[in-house]
């Protein structure tokens, strides 16, 4: 029998991840600038958010439909059929949407909330560009996403081992968001594949974020921790490193340590 082996790389998908500032404005700018008239899927964490986002996009002139498990079977089927058969339809969905959906010309996948894991992210973004043409996987994330997901995990029915595994997966997803190196390389390495250092088709390759060598700053901070007796919090250590002659710093005599003011 013949075996077909496929890797995890989807070279036609451009991966882009950015922090939430004004997510609705960021979304509308992305759609109007790059994907006006294209079919796509927008993933949200809650059912309520899918409906609110779909309604808002309709007001902005987009053909957007909600999809989640709380809708009636008839409405889910109707929205799904419109997405599959018509051009330029956007589905705003929870993760309930996508399994078994094979629409080759999906031009973008948007995540308005952080996925639970790299596995989920890869599976959901993989629904874009199945025709081999260029597609975009675009995500905005924020600290509130992480807090919300951790609360959901802690409140789930799983045992402690399951919850710990869920937290590890979430941490890996957050790590993918915060790296400054190639996202495609990180994705492929996560799944055990070798990959070149740069793909040339993700945000960190196309617009490398500014970086700096924090070695010296870390050494100064650790030295300050040691010289102040390893018993003070971050705010106090910042005062010492910044050379602030506060009442507490003076009373402890830490204006005399060698690390006083070296972080100015």
Residue ranges and their predicted role:
Residues 1-160, 165-168, 195, 203-204:
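Helicase motor core with emphasis on the C-terminal RecA-like subdomain
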Residues 31, 83, 177, 225-229:
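Short helix-to-turn junction characteristic of helix-turn-helix DNA-binding domains
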Residues 133, 145-146, 178-182, 194-197, ...:
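Proline-centered turn/helix-capping motifs that create local helix->coil transitions or kinks
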Residues 140-144, 179, 190-194, 205, ...:
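Short acidic/histidine-centered micro-motifs embedded in hydrophobic/aromatic stretches
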